[in-house]
Amino acid sequence: MKQLFFFFLVFPFVVWSQSDFEKGEKLFGEAKFKQAQVLFESYLKSNSNHIKTIEYLGDTASHNSSWENAVFYYRKLKDLKPNEANYYYKYGGALGMKATQVNKFRALGMIGEIRGSFEKAIVLNPKHIEARWALVMYYIQLPGIIGGSEAKAIKYSNELLKLSPIDGYLSKGQIFEYFKKYALAEEQYKKAIAAGSTKKGTQLLANLQKNKLKKTSDDSISDFVDNIIKK
């Protein structure tokens, strides 16, 4: 009887202590990220190493573009679970976004850790698709003088092709488009569509064709102005 009494005494507290997390999950699923954040923070106060709560807080910070906070929570995750590939991937992504908000000198100092985080994710999970995508974008967007490389981007794109043909074609299309090799990019997007990426592939192909038309129009205007100047 005493055990039963103890159960009824403790049970409401257990339900209450879990409710902030559960309510936070529900709000997160409804994309109410700021409201979810408040509840997750409340839950974390009494559950300081609760992995899923920390991940949710990193994710809500990311959705709210609060990259400093996202980096904080994802760093805590990878420290708590150093063998979890996805936490390195998320940390690298948040750190990359943070780098866009600081001065160039600070950003330069973060480059190695960003790349290293994505590479670590692949070491821990050799089939990690998102980390390879991140490295493709990393190498094409970074200036060559500080480590950008079309060849390295293609290397990771080729790895994607082996894991997921659609991701391989789409990533290679992105590389070719970035370096203005439009015919090659179009070919890759069409391959992605044929492989089953009807929505994303069609969207990227349409954007490519739109950009090509704009470039042709801009070049025509430029040629027209040049001809006037020459005359």
Language-model features, listed with the residues they occupy:
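Residue at a conserved register position within TPR or TPR-like alpha-solenoid repeats
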Residues: 27, 61, 95, 102, ...
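Canonical tetratricopeptide repeat
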Residues: 52, 56-59, 90-91, 134, ...
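Residue-level recognition of tetratricopeptide repeat
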Residues: 50, 84, 128, 165-167, ...
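Structural motif corresponding to the intra-repeat A-B loop/turn of tetratricopeptide repeats
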Residues: 30, 64, 98, 142, ...
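N-terminal leader/linker segments that initiate helical-solenoid repeat arrays
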Residues: 15-56, 62
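Structural marker of alpha-solenoid helical repeat scaffolds
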Residues: 46, 80, 124, 160-163, ...
